[in-house]
Amino acid sequence: MHQLAEELSDYYHLSLRDKLIYKSRIESVPSSTGTYISSESYFISLFVACIILLDIIDIPEKKKFLEGKSTFVASVLPELKAYQRFVNRLIGDGNSTVEESQFQSNCEEVVKVYKYAFETESDEYYERFEISRELKQKCIAASNGHKYY
């Protein structure tokens, strides 16, 4: 999460003050978020970094993100090297160099997880990554510095 947060702050050219605030908030995320026991933990880390950043730079976009209506995951994240490694490691075969078409397919899968967690209200279970319906609540809790279970 720290590498992704660093790249996001560079991508948005945050001022030194905002970088320090962002880094401090990222560091205040409970350590249980970064244990990566399940694939859900990876997605929590990814989405928490986005929520905290949007809280600093664009509150209306953060609101859209939390409602599942943002294009942030599809448009901004693929520009970042840390995200590319994340996607290729979690969804792909672990190879850091995959074809562009495979990378796009992997990114679409992350967008599906985002939509499942933040937009959909159904009780269905996202089987591919064993993601619970409480993913959104866990992300919000972690981004506010609270532990989630």
Residues of each region from the PLM?
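The feature marks long, low-complexity, polar/acidic/proline-rich intrinsically disordered regions embedded
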Residues: 2-149
